[in-house]
Amino acid sequence: MKSDKPFLERYFYDPTLLQKGLIFALYPFSLIYQCIATIKRKTAKKHDFKIPIISIGNLIAGGSGKTPFILEIAPRYQEVAVVSRGYQRDSKGLVVVSVKGNILVPQKTAGDEAYLLALNLKQASVIVSEKRELGVLKALELGSKIVFLDDGFRFNFNQFNALLKPKVPPYYPFCLPSGLYRENIKSYKEAHLVITEDKDYQRITSITNPTKRMLLVTAIANPSRLDAFLPKEVVKKLYFRDHAPFDLKLLEKEFYQNNATSLLVTSKDLVKLQDCKLPLSVLDLKLEICPKVLEEIDRYILSYPCNIKEHL
């Protein structure tokens, strides 16, 4: 845990001279990683599930708004399922998190992002599975006619690939470990739709229950991206690794040491603080998506005979 910008975020986005030396020393490993990722994706067996599958993905590791994007577009349709890996969950294998808004498992079993999706998508079913094809098959079994695939670009499915592109890219366009990309940056050209922040969508934030002295607590990737949305009432920032569980005793200690009046958390972090007795303020993030993007997704969904306008 750090209260300033984490080491890895500096390494990938604003490296020091020493870090740049390390980056170029590791570059041969990045080339190997890139080749393996590309070969694995392009030689994988093709799956066609005969229903529209919309993959909301990104090329960089870590957060880029995939979950808020799905939260924004999935409610526009009926008979929908969301299939995700379920990062940092306590469970293994396929788990049905919710069926049409009826939540079946606790947050730790689902993972924070999948649980957040289940809480907010009342008309959708949410499924987690390391093997996404099993998740899609379960969605079909549940009667879903549209599937949103969280982070599915690397899977060789017959799907509509939408890639989110951040406003601020990593410092170097390299793959891991020298850069933050999981695929060659040229893979943007393979997407059906590239959705660029501040061009094709805008982030809109609000704070529920703001107080005079808020202690920011978050476990998201690249947490300094929140800085642009933080009010002056934030007295300190506590950063944890992405998806990390929170130590409630540590939070209580920091809360009183900083004379805080509430913890400021994101909606994603909030699902892990259901047992927290401290006052909570919530930084709500929503996306305003360009109509042309929505029209492209509509066009793909309507190309399947099982989806007519009355079902949208």
From Swiss-Prot:
Its EC number is 2.7.1.130. InterPro entries: LpxK (IPR003758). It comes from the Bacteria. GO terms for cellular component: plasma membrane. Keywords: ATP-binding, Kinase, Lipid A biosynthesis, Lipid biosynthesis, Lipid metabolism, Nucleotide-binding, Transferase. It is an enzyme of class 2 (transferase). It catalyses: a lipid A disaccharide + ATP = a lipid IVA + ADP + H(+). GO terms for molecular function: ATP binding; tetraacyldisaccharide 4'-kinase activity. GO terms for biological process: lipid A biosynthetic process; lipopolysaccharide core region biosynthetic process. Pathway: Glycolipid biosynthesis; lipid IV(A) biosynthesis; lipid IV(A) from (3R)-3-hydroxytetradecanoyl-[acyl-carrier-protein] and UDP-N-acetyl-alpha-D-glucosamine: step 6/6. Pfam families: LpxK. ATP binds at residues 60-67. Transfers the gamma-phosphate of ATP to the 4'-position of a tetraacyldisaccharide 1-phosphate intermediate (termed DS-1-P) to form tetraacyldisaccharide 1,4'-bis-phosphate (lipid IVA). HAMAP family: LpxK (MF_00409). Belongs to the LpxK family. This is Tetraacyldisaccharide 4'-kinase. The gene is lpxK.
